[in-house]
Amino acid sequence: CCAHSAKNDVDDVGFIERVVNFTIEMHNVDSDRIYASGWSNGCAMAQRLAMESSHIFAAVGCMAMYLVNDPTEQYSPIPIMEVHGFLDQIVLYESTILSIPFNEDMWTEPEAYETGAVENMFEWAGHNDCSGGVKTFEMNALYSIQGFDECANNATVQLMTIFAAQHNPYSNDNDDGTLIGSSFIGTQGLVESSEIVWDFLILHNKSNLSVGSF
């Protein structure tokens, strides 16, 4: 989706679509309930799949990154949820400026400097033809979930903000045995963000997406 993959025109979307289609052919898969998720650049990839492969995916829920690719004419609104730590030290909550050196496709894109978690939510609300103001779906001492639920295709848009989380908004630390990985501490079990995202995803399937409904 991004970084060297985008610069070198690697067809990540085409590859993932082929993997999905092959899996459907070989296994008993409910093709109405195919979802995409990811963390950091993986979240950017998941949102690119939402934009470019909305005919395949029923919903997307991902962690700690924004849509960094241009919108496409073939996009049909699907539900989107992005989870972001307010204290994210890599992909800032207010902008992607610290991510730009690592994503060469963003170097000449001025709007890349402007995108933050809230802006990303509003951009998806525009893509999904949402109306009305921002709603608060959940608010407590640890996190909030806000967004839009009056959208085309019933394609709600949600932003989950974890107030004390950094770049790793998951419950557990990123213990991959490396110095960099060990610096990405999770919420220590205080916020089960994966479960919340999964609960969001399973509410949606292709059969429930009805164009023009709110």
Residue positions per predicted region:
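Gly/Ser-rich "nucleophile elbow"/oxyanion-hole loop immediately N-terminal to the catalytic nucleophile
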Residues: C1-N41, M51, I56, S131
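Extracellular/periplasmic catalytic domains that process cell-envelope and extracellular macromolecules
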Residues: N28-V29, S37, N41, E52-H55, ...
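Short beta-strand immediately N-terminal to the catalytic nucleophile in serine-hydrolase-like folds
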Residues: A36-G38, M63, V83
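Hydrolases whose catalytic domains are alpha/beta-hydrolase-1, hotdog thioesterase
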Residues: M45-L49
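A conserved short beta-strand
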Residues: H55-L67, I78-P79
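Short beta-strand/loop motif that positions the catalytic acidic residue
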Residues: E82-H84, D88
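C-terminal catalytic histidine-bearing segment of alpha/beta-hydrolase fold enzymes
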Residues: V83, A112-G116, A125-G212
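Acidic catalytic loop of the alpha/beta-hydrolase fold
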Residues: D88-V91, H167-P169
